[in-house]
Amino acid sequence: MRIDYSIDHAVQLEVNFEVEGFTILLGQSGEGKTTLLRAVAGLLPARGEPFGGLLPQQRAVGYLPQGYALFPHLRAWENVAFALPRGPQRRPQALELLARVRLVDVAERYPPALSGGQQQRVALARALARKPQLLLLDEPSSALDAATRDEVMAELISEMHEFGLPALAVSHDPHLAALADRVAVMSGRRIVQQGTPAEVLSRPGSPAVARLLGHRNLFTARVVGHENSSTTLLRWEAANGITLRLLRQSELTAGQLVQWMIAPTAVRLPSLKPELYRPDNPVTGRVESRLNLGAYFQVALSCGSERLWVAATSDLVRHHGLETGSEITVDLGNNGLVC
């Protein structure tokens, strides 16, 4: 489903992106993410598709506002029934919807007696009562505690897949991006990048996108010039003035100060087979810390006055004997450098 909307009310906004499965629209506070949801739901004047020109009650959308907006004085089933037509089938239909989200056993409880995840699923059942074609979620993880956030969100996304219902969730939390089927990034009140989580997280389109995604390896360098038709040279002054080579960026000029980034997964340790190791951008650093995360280690290298984060396989870390204080030369490559 394509979202194509222009908004002049409250904030000026023009966006165009795809919703596939569970899609996260990521952006900082104030970008207009909630405004977009309200416009798609018909609660704000806007131009666009889908549902353009329809009254709110005519739009096949389910809307989960931030905090879920459950009525505290109504039982769980009564909150769901609030979205259903009056009649003798109202309660059975509400209980059926609660059963779909595996909550029929708490139907008689009031919202304050429910966990954050249970409240979210009651709100989901209420949204499903409208038989929506699209589900809209505003900051779905904001009311969840850190200890249960991943589990609750993973269960919610699994339910979306079971229902075959496309969902658009807006958030400023980059952690959610990894759980989604698709990610769209908003900056400057426009979509600046979209794709699968693997595509967007591994290669942000700009340092600004990298910051939104929570990347740590963000640095400043000075442009030296262009070495040839395919290479641009940068001087990383804070890391002892080493020279970096990246794919040619013709718009950069000598002397210009630029931001650049590299994903921790793009930083390469020397291969187990030295004859296969041909570094493009060798950088030497000293191990400040390392954290064993099971399949890989998160390693912090001190490079001059900068800290470079590396995600390295356990085999490579053990092979090179990386311990706090040891020195290692890694390769930044050139394809992974984003400027």
Spans of model-derived segments:
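Catalytic Walker B motif of ABC-type/P-loop ATPase nucleotide-binding domains
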Residues: 135-139
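Conserved ABC ATPase signature
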Residues: 110-114, 118
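Conserved ABC ATPase "signature" region
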Residues: 91-106, 157-158
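A short, proline-enriched helix->beta-strand linker immediately N-terminal to the Walker B motif
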Residues: 129-133
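Conserved ABC ATPase "signature" C-loop
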Residues: 189-190
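Glycine/charge-rich catalytic "coupling/switch" loops of P-loop NTPases
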Residues: 240-290, 315-339
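ABC ATPase "signature
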Residues: 194-195, 203
